[in-house]
């Protein structure tokens, strides 16, 4: 098996190194990752300029683009052989609920799915994570499970791991995405020249975080595994929308 690894924290991030070290005894590993931190890049592709891919001192391939760029290049011609699946992570921080819309880590996995490969995004749920060995062990266990029972090519698994020692984990939970309240206000300040600047505010607090959600699983010291889909259509509203639209509507 040939596994492509990427992330959004950059090619030198401890989480990516931990993931590569954990999976390399089990499969052929190729790492293609951003040359710098691109957290929050979501599914953006770089279209206004060419991209450069270079071999870093640690042997990883670094790209001067987004996580989506990295996976796209890797699968569509950068590599000599196409990988069989994509692992993205280990992200430095949770990707729970609404976070998946912004996450470059989840986007890297999503791009793998767009290009026909099963993909796993794995995140360590803490602001300053420490227990990368726990998330690495989870990645090993999931890979072993995938080998026993392969994932369909249209599968994206969003995995969040509590930042605790491995022996404190309380198992795995199949979860749905929770939700957050509205994000906090931007932080308004001034640069050294007195010009107004803004920092994006913090994510909103939990809104939908009850049993069955990814938030709840993490609070219970369980690994949260959420299956994601690409189709964002809200099917139960199609008929209502058709009745609401002005003029003649055709299906």
UniProtKB/Swiss-Prot annotation:
A divalent metal cation binds at residues 8-9, 39, 91. One of its GO terms (cellular component) is cytoplasm. Its cofactor is a divalent metal cation. It is found in: Cytoplasm. Binds 1 divalent metal cation per subunit. It catalyses: a ribonucleoside 5'-phosphate + H2O = a ribonucleoside + phosphate. Gene3D superfamilies: Survival protein SurE-like phosphatase/nucleotidase. Keywords: Cytoplasm, Hydrolase, Metal-binding, Nucleotide-binding. InterPro entries: SurE, SurE-like_Pase/nucleotidase, SurE-like_sf. Its EC number is 3.1.3.5. SUPFAM superfamilies: SurE-like (SSF64167). It comes from the Bacteria. GO terms for molecular function: 3'-nucleotidase activity; 5'-nucleotidase activity; exopolyphosphatase activity; metal ion binding; nucleotide binding. It is an enzyme of class 3 (hydrolase). Pfam families: SurE. Belongs to the SurE nucleotidase family. PANTHER family: 5'-NUCLEOTIDASE SURE (PTHR30457), 5'_3'-NUCLEOTIDASE SURE (PTHR30457:SF12). Nucleotidase that shows phosphatase activity on nucleoside 5'-monophosphates. This is 5'-nucleotidase SurE. The gene is surE.
